[in-house]
Regions:
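A positively charged, amphipathic N-terminal helix/segment that binds anionic biomolecules
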Residues: 1-140, 144-257, 261-268, 276-277, ...
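Acidic, low-complexity interaction regions
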Residues: 205, 243, 250-356
């Protein structure tokens, strides 16, 4: 496909148009700068049209294919993130199984550090991070954390940092294996926290693209770190509503939803509106407003987002997935309201049977 190529020139780069001419127009050069293409990337191809959905392809330092999309396309893709939940559910066991295995690798091998980041991603719900945000806004995520952002004391890690939108985060987690790995990463020179040693023993800094490549290597699918936040948001709000139980009136149901969303937003580090719009499956909330809610989880199988109970899906997760699928089928088959029919103002509680 015709496009623009980046070529090394002195300490910087030249950009070559499809006709082989060096691009010098300031507005074009500003556009390329705004794409924030890492200097280490090679075989860089840039779309000739600024509104093309795929803006950049390249190879990273390890030879892996990388992509940059137009923000508008990313917004469209975000609209399908709730569908991506089900794709993640198919392979989450693979990710958890591989993470548990890779954490035990010797030294600070690449896959060991990637597994550690993914473990923390799922356990703490800290954003994956972006070099763009770290440089422009001094806000951090897992892959952009600095050594100063974590304190390790025995088996406990405590992360304190400024996140997206200036929100201050203080997150503690206790795990002996993870604490030891993070402490060893801290001991490597360089301000970045997460680093690994490549096959030649050279230090490499972990980037978000590395973590996504690790997830895609495991699953063979386009799974990214961001998918974990949608998964967690839906599971957390379902957990809160499940504990609250059905409401007696629609007004009470709306209040309960707000409370559940607020708890979830606090865990994710989002505002209520952002959390509700982007990280909670809408079928879950519409079902609750109609009086349909998951029954309480038996005490012996209660699920905690902070505890890993093996690679398989946990009982709460399986229940939520089955519930949402059931609601989607119900909504698909539900006849449209006639001109004379009115929705009930008071929801009728109905309990779904727990999964066997």
């Amino acid at each position: 496909m015709p496009g623009i190529r980046r070529q090394k020139h002195g300490r910087g780069f030249n950009y070559i148009d499809p006709d082989g001419q060096v691009i010098r127009a300031p507005e074009m050069l500003n556009r390329f700068k705004a794409l924030v293409i890492p200097p280490a990337w090679t075989d860089v191809w840039i779309c000739a049209h600024e509104d093309g959905h795929l803006q950049v392809t390249a190879r990273d330092a390890r030879g892996r294919k990388q992509y940059r999309y137009h923000p508008g396309f990313r917004q469209h893709r975000d609209g399908t993130k709730f569908e991506r939940m089900f794709e993640l559910s198919d392979v989450l066991w693979k990710i958890r199984e591989r993470v548990e295995s890779d954490i035990t690798l010797p030294g600070l091998a690449r896959d060991k550090v990637m597994a550690t980041v993914v473990w923390l991603l799922e356990t703490t719900l800290i954003r994956i991070g972006s070099d763009e945000y770290a440089k422009a806004n001094k806000s951090f995520g897992l892959t952009t954390l600095r050594r100063r952002h974590v304190a390790v004391k025995g088996n406990e890690l405590r992360f304190e940092f400024r996140g997206k939108s200036g929100i201050q985060h203080a997150v503690a987690v206790t795990d002996r294996r993870i604490a030891r790995i993070v402490q060893r990463c801290q001991e490597l020179r360089g301000e970045e926290l997460f680093k690994y040693l490549d096959d030649e023993g050279k230090k490499q800094v972990v980037q978000a693209e590395d973590v996504n490549a690790y997830l895609q290597d495991i699953t063979g699918r386009d799974i990214t770190a961001k998918d974990f936040r949608t998964w967690a948001g839906t599971m957390l709000v379902a957990q809160a509503l499940r504990a609250t139980g059905p409401a007696e009136t629609r007004r009470e149901a709306e209040k309960n939803i707000v409370a559940a969303v607020d708890v979830t937003a606090k865990r994710l580090g989002n505002t209520r509106s952002v959390c509700r719009k982007y990280y909670i499956h809408p079928a879950l909330l519409s079902a609750y407003l109609e009086g349909s809610v998951l029954p309480p989880l038996p005490e012996r199988t209660k699920w905690s987002n902070r505890k890993h109970s093996g690679p398989v899906l946990r009982q709460h997760e399986m229940d939520v997935l089955a519930f949402i699928k059931s609601r989607l089928k119900h909504d698909h088959n539900k006849p449209a309201l006639s001109a004379t029919s009115q929705p009930r103002s008071t929801p009728q509680p109905q309990a779904n049977k727990p999964a066997a």
